[in-house]
Amino acid sequence: MVTVNEFRKAQRAEGPATVLAIGTATPPNCVDQSAYADYYFRITNSEDKPELKEKFRRMCEKSMINTRYMHLTEDLLKQNPSFCEYMASSLDARQDIVVNEVPKLGKEAALRAIKEWGQPKSKITHLIFCTTSGVDMPGADFRLTKLLGLRPSVKRFMMYQQGCFAGGTVLRLAKDLAENNKNARVLVVCSEITVITFRGPNDTHLDSLVGQALFGDGAGAVIVGSDPVIGIEKPLFEIVSAAQTILPDSDGAIDGHLREVGLTFHLLKDVPGLISKNIRKSLVEAFKPLGISDWNSIFWIAHPGGPAILDQVETELSLKPEKLKSTRQVLRDYGNMSSACVLFILDEMRKASAKDGHRTTGEGLDWGVLFGFGPGLTVETVVLHSVPP
């Protein structure tokens, strides 16, 4: 008869959790950031606010975003005029859209990850689904399980309304699941649609306008598992460690509240400063055990909350401009997609590394960091180890 310890050991994987495949997806509707101020003030019937429009135009110009993708088209907004008002009761109509569209967009990203993985979807043992919107029962995890045709016994984890840091959270959870369950293959999906947050402008709430200038829609998916099957599964990044912390003196810096008008966001101006002055501590705690203290010697995947956050982190740590190349590229091409962003950046980095002939998926470097920043202020710090492409 085996002992409890022998049984527990047999249930666990031998190697570290590894990202085995990545997939991304966006809605087909692409928005040109340079023309967005005109479109936004026209569609929200706010042309009578020229000064506010010019403020918003400057926000769009300073965002360092070229394009975003949005499920909300002009036709859909005309069908739902309450979305275009600043504080009109509209939650039911928004909810009807997101409970269906969030899982659908997640399905597109998941199918691309599964295709790259090369294994039958019947081998998926766990599902983690993350989204900021569309709370329902059964949840988006249930809907995605049905849409993909996963086994009914798949073990599901649903994470609602975590916000922009959650791209790190899902990897932390996937790491624990993969390493503590032998042969586990975890499908992770982050799907974000701004239907729940879109609204017209208001002179007294400029923080709401900031969100209208930054946020876009997208879904990212990864397959995570330990002990890759040689010749079939190709590891991309090893997840070495993961930590979460609440920054000191940051209460109320980023808040989101679900109301009859949808999800409202409130931001303090000093969010970039709060993150940049605390980020070194998270880095030291994560990399001191590895003997690493040169932040230019690692590759970087940072949630692109906005250009000001990236600029101040870069300055605080004396990072070379190329360190945040992949992060800035995703911000430029997609905007801030909340939890999905870091998965897009993982994808961008491994593709760019292969294209540029680097020896690893992490721009030729062995070690790297993935940061998620969001409400709380909460910071997720994930240490990654790259592999040869």
Curated annotation (Swiss-Prot):
<keyword id="KW-0808">Transferase</keyword>
<keyword id="KW-0284">Flavonoid biosynthesis</keyword>
<dbReference type="InterPro" id="IPR012328">
    <property type="entry name" value="Chalcone/stilbene_synt_C"/>
</dbReference>
<keyword id="KW-0012">Acyltransferase</keyword>
<dbReference type="InterPro" id="IPR011141">
    <property type="entry name" value="Polyketide_synthase_type-III"/>
</dbReference>
<comment type="function">
    <text>The primary product of this enzyme is 4,2',4',6'-tetrahydroxychalcone (also termed naringenin-chalcone or chalcone) which can under specific conditions spontaneously isomerize into naringenin.</text>
</comment>
<dbReference type="GO" id="GO:0009813">
    <property type="term" value="P:flavonoid biosynthetic process"/>
</dbReference>
<feature type="active site">
    <location>
        <position position="164"/>
    </location>
</feature>
<dbReference type="InterPro" id="IPR016039">
    <property type="entry name" value="Thiolase-like"/>
</dbReference>
<dbReference type="GO" id="GO:0030639">
    <property type="term" value="P:polyketide biosynthetic process"/>
</dbReference>
<dbReference type="Pfam" id="PF00195">
    <property type="entry name" value="Chal_sti_synt_N"/>
</dbReference>
<dbReference type="InterPro" id="IPR001099">
    <property type="entry name" value="Chalcone/stilbene_synt_N"/>
</dbReference>
<dbReference type="GO" id="GO:0016210">
    <property type="term" value="F:naringenin-chalcone synthase activity"/>
</dbReference>
<dbReference type="Pfam" id="PF02797">
    <property type="entry name" value="Chal_sti_synt_C"/>
</dbReference>
<comment type="pathway">
    <text>Secondary metabolite biosynthesis; flavonoid biosynthesis.</text>
</comment>
<protein>
    <recommendedName>
        <fullName>Chalcone synthase 1</fullName>
        <ecNumber>2.3.1.74</ecNumber>
    </recommendedName>
</protein>
<dbReference type="InterPro" id="IPR018088">
    <property type="entry name" value="Chalcone/stilbene_synthase_AS"/>
</dbReference>
<comment type="similarity">
    <text>Belongs to the thiolase-like superfamily. Chalcone/stilbene synthases family.</text>
</comment>
